[in-house]
């Protein structure tokens, strides 16, 4: 059993989607970041960086882990699913694109959300800088998905799970997904997965998955 500390953000949804995909039982502990609940002492014990998501593996001596990418890798290895260790190319492509998301998509899209959605008009320079970088990243993704069905290649993996929740906020980024036909194809296929639909709703929200 996994204890999941999360909120309905892209990083939080990665882990709930992953848990649904691998069929692993989990308890949900909502951490409302709008109310600064991530700074409560009990959560600090699980996540020293005061950020969601975080997990505690009750079956592994209450082993705790934070950082969404690390959690995805842990759950993939624990379950033996969504990361192909028998195919070295597929395995390292998965890690490669997971790191691409962690180092590029997450930080850059997050800055777009901050300057374009929440602080629009306060810094034309920041809006242009981060929006331009977001479009570049979408173009990189579009090219990759024009060559392969999934981000890693032939197989659905944690790389797809890590990236998809960030693209699901294309409206926050003022991105027209129709400009990226391969991303749109992949995004729609992902949105149709039952596990993605279930994981999207964690914790307790009724937000619809945005349609491109």
Where are the regions that the model predicts?
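Phosphate-coordinating loops and pocket residues in cytosolic domains that bind phosphorylated ligands
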Residues: 45, 163, 192, 201-202
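GST-like fold's C-terminal all-alpha helical module
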Residues: 75, 97, 101-194
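Short secondary-structure boundary/hinge segments and terminal tails
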Residues: 36-37, 93, 188, 207-209
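Short, solvent-exposed turn/loop segments enriched in Gly/Ser/Thr/Pro and often Arg
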Residues: 32, 158, 203-206
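A generic structural-conservation signal
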Residues: 28, 84, 154, 179, ...
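GST-like domain detector, emphasizing the conserved glutathione-binding G-site
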Residues: 1-128, 142
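Terminal-tail/helix-coil boundary detector
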Residues: 196-212
């Amino acid at each position: 059993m996994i204890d999941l500390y999360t909120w309905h953000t892209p990083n939080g949804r990665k882990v709930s989607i992953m848990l649904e995909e691998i069929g692993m039982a989990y308890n949900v502990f909502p951490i409302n970041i709008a109310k600064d609940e991530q700074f409560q002492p009990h959560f600090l014990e699980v996540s020293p960086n005061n950020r969601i998501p975080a997990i505690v593996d009750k079956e592994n001596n209450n082993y705790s882990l934070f950082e969404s990418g690390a959690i995805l890798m842990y759950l993939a290895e624990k379950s033996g699913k969504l990361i192909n260790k028998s195919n070295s190319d597929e395995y390292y492509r998965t890690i490669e694109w997971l790191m691409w998301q962690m180092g590029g998509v997450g930080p850059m899209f997050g800055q777009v959300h901050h300057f374009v959605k929440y602080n629009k008009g306060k810094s034309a320079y920041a809006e242009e800088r981060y929006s331009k970088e977001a479009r570049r990243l979408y173009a990189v993704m579009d090219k990759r998905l024009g060559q392969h069905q999934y981000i890693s290649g032939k197989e659905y993996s944690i790389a797809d799970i890590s990236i998809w929740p960030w693209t699901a906020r294309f409206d926050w980024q003022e991105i027209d997904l129709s400009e990226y036909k391969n991303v749109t194809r992949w995004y729609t296929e992902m949105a149709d997965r039952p596990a993605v639909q279930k994981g999207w709703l964690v914790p307790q929200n009724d937000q619809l998955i945005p349609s491109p």
